[in-house]
């Protein structure tokens, strides 16, 4: 693929983002990724935003349908229809996740030439295995949970050694890894400990905040604090869903 073709695909992705056509955006950035050339920071972010929206729509649908399916007052036929529809959404969600994981393993992680990119892509790998874990059951769930944790842990080790505590990618990783502990592993103590450590480490080094990433970093710090507040007050198990965000 020529440089011109690649630039056109990136431009298409930007147009698709502006018009909120995230499936088109994802396909354009998938084609860019498949050229095998390392992505620039801008291209990396376009890819991430595209697939986050594509998979996010399915995750949201899945939660709504699952909730309807579990309502005991529904008739057997309605429950069956809800189950079938949930399974259809699940299939779409799985296909998207494995598409992203394929791009990560085949192109993105092997080509990552600096710690920032490596952490970004390993975090992404952890995220997409986590999304699979949200809908998986049995042995399949155990496998994707292990894969998610391994990717997050690899990213976490690199970020601690190579990135400032205020770096938005390091903070975003801590945010999502803590959500993984809370939601997927059902380990609120570990989730709180990880989130608090990341928040405290960033506060201690606020003077290292890069002007360019100030907004991103402080937003993720706020999300970490929001989650800590929610998780520490959630002793009654009122079913509030922990917030997740801050993917850059």
Curated annotation (Swiss-Prot):
Report the PROSITE patterns cross-referenced here: 1433_1, 1433_2
Q: Where in the cell is it found?
A: Cytoplasm
SMART domains noted in UniProt: 14_3_3 (SM00101)
Q: Which UniProt keywords apply?
A: Cytoplasm
Q: Which domain of life is it from?
A: Eukaryota
User: What are the record's GO terms for cellular component?
Assistant: cytoplasm
- Is Cytoplasm one of the keywords UniProt gives this record? yes
| InterPro entries per UniProt | 14-3-3, 14-3-3_CS, 14-3-3_dom_sf, 14-3-3_domain
Enumerate the Gene3D superfamilies for this protein: 14-3-3 domain
Q: In which broad location class does this protein mainly occur, judging by the first location in its UniProt entry? A: cytoplasm
Q: What does this protein do?
A: Adapter protein implicated in the regulation of a large spectrum of both general and specialized signaling pathways. Binds to a large number of partners, usually by recognition of a phosphoserine or phosphothreonine motif. Binding generally results in the modulation of the activity of the binding partner.
Subunit comment: Homodimer.
The record's family statement is: Belongs to the 14-3-3 family.
Its name, as the record gives it, is 14-3-3 protein zeta
Organism field:
Aedes aegypti (Yellowfever mosquito)
The gene name reads 14-3-3zeta
């Amino acid at each position: 693929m020529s440089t011109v073709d690649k630039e056109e695909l990136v431009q298409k992705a930007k147009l698709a983002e502006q018009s909120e056509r995230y499936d088109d955006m994802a396909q354009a950035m998938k084609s860019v990724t498949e050229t095998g050339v390392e992505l620039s920071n801008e291209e990396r972010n376009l890819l991430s935003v595209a697939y986050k929206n594509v998979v996010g729509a399915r995750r949201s649908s899945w939660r709504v349908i699952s909730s309807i399916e579990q309502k005991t007052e529904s008739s057997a036929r309605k429950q069956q229809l809800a189950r079938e529809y949930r399974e259809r959404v699940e299939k779409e969600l799985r296909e998207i996740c494995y598409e992203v994981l394929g791009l990560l393993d085949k192109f993105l992680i092997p080509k990552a030439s600096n710690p920032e990119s490596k952490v970004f892509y390993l975090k992404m790998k952890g995220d997409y295995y986590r999304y699979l874990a949200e809908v998986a059951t049995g042995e399949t769930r155990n496998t994707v949970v292990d894969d998610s944790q391994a990717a997050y842990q690899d990213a976490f080790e690199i970020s601690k050694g190579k990135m400032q505590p205020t770096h938005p990618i390091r903070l975003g990783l801590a945010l999502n890894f803590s959500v993984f502990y809370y939601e997927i592993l059902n380990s609120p103590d570990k989730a709180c400990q990880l989130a608090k450590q990341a928040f405290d480490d960033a506060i201690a080094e606020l003077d290292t905040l890069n002007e360019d990433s100030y907004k991103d970093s402080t937003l993720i710090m706020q999300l970490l604090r929001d989650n800590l507040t929610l998780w520490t007050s959630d002793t009654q198990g009122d079913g509030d869903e922990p917030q997740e965000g801050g993917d850059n």
